């Protein structure tokens, strides 16, 4: 939970 956008960055 934290990085759920684009580009898909780690949490």
From Swiss-Prot:
Among the GO biological process terms of this entry, one is: regulation of blood pressure
Q: Which GO terms describe its cellular component?
A: extracellular region
Q: What GO molecular function terms would the record report?
A: peptidase inhibitor activity; toxin activity
Q: Where in the cell is it found?
A: Secreted
Keyword annotations from UniProtKB, A to Z:
Hypotensive agent, Metalloenzyme inhibitor, Metalloprotease inhibitor, Protease inhibitor, Pyrrolidone carboxylic acid, Secreted, Toxin
> Where does tissue-level expression of this protein occur?
Expressed by the venom gland.
Pyrrolidone carboxylic acid-modified residues are: 1
Q: What does this protein do?
A: Bradykinin-potentiating peptides both inhibits the activity of the angiotensin-converting enzyme (ACE) and enhances the action of bradykinin by inhibiting the peptidases that inactivate it. It acts as an indirect hypotensive agent.
Please state which protein family the record places this protein in. Answer: Belongs to the bradykinin-potentiating peptide family.
Protein's UniProt name: Bradykinin-potentiating peptide 11
- What is the source species? Bothrops jararaca
Tell me the organism's taxonomic lineage: Eukaryota, Metazoa, Chordata, Craniata, Vertebrata
């Amino acid at each position: 939970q934290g990085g759920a956008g684009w580009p898909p960055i780690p949490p």
